[in-house]
Amino acid sequence: MPTNLNALLRYKIIDECLSNDQLSCTIDVLIEKCTQKLSEFQGVYSVSERTIRNDIRILRSDALGFNSPIVVNQGVYSYSESGYSIFG
């Protein structure tokens, strides 16, 4: 499991974004969405690009058992499998 609540919330937000076929998930969009949600729930006002890239790396890996099929095409991140979710 993630080492802290903020990481778990970011994973959930990233998963929601990548699961949404109508959203073009660039790094900037993921940063914006994570910052917005975390500021609402946790009072965190900024999430760095490095943090999001590291989260994506962790979600792709088997380190925490996610092994998510995340692909990037021209800077847009998505799941390679339609309807995929790490929480569903």
Q: What would you call each of these model-derived segments?
A:
Residues 1-88:
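Short, basic/aromatic recognition patches that contact phosphate-bearing ligands
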